[in-house]
From Swiss-Prot:
Toroid-shaped homodecamer, composed of two pentamers of five dimers. Belongs to the GTP cyclohydrolase I family. Zn(2+) binds at residues 75, 78, 146. Keywords: GTP-binding, Hydrolase, Metal-binding, Nucleotide-binding, One-carbon metabolism, Zinc. It comes from Campylobacter jejuni subsp. jejuni serotype O:2 (strain ATCC 700819 / NCTC 11168). Its EC number is 3.5.4.16. It holds the Pfam family GTP_cyclohydroI. The gene is folE. Gene3D superfamilies: 1.10.286.10, 3.30.1130.10. PROSITE patterns: GTP_CYCLOHYDROL_1_1. This is GTP cyclohydrolase 1.
Amino acid sequence: MQKKFEDCVKTMLEIIGENPNREGLIKTPNRVFKAYEFLTSGYTQNVKEILNDALFESSNNEMVLVRDIEFYSLCEHHLLPFFGRAHVAYIPNKKVVGLSKIPRLVEVFARRLQIQEQLTEQIAQALMENVDAKGVGVVIEARHMCVEMRGVQKANSTTTTSALRGIFLKNEKTREEFFSLINSAKQVRF
């Protein structure tokens, strides 16, 4: 598989008019393979294993929010990066998940070929299903290089997506609290 991938990179370099045998490009096919192996490592990770090993009994039934989770991913349409911050909240149902597992969950899905809308949905659904939460809210704010570097070339434009499940979808006060905590957080820095 690695050789096939590297051969494709060499072919691409030739097609754009480059010499894949020149000094600066000799190791590029291998470097690109390693980069994509890492950037798509989410396909080989198991969400259940990550979350189920970190579920703890708890009487807490208030919102848990992990905000400003930095991530990067690859747009499935152009294979160009998009990156930003995810804000993930849930309301426990007798169990809480270890806080470090929420950013890990974001990484699992971000390290795949993605569109932002799907990434947002996948994080929300995985948390809802695997933690048995009363509700989940996910907001992602991201910049897309396929928008900034090509096509419309609109630098610094931001796309925001949200996914709500359970009580976040059904209860207006819960939803308002979630969005309020995200917005107030932008003004507080440690």
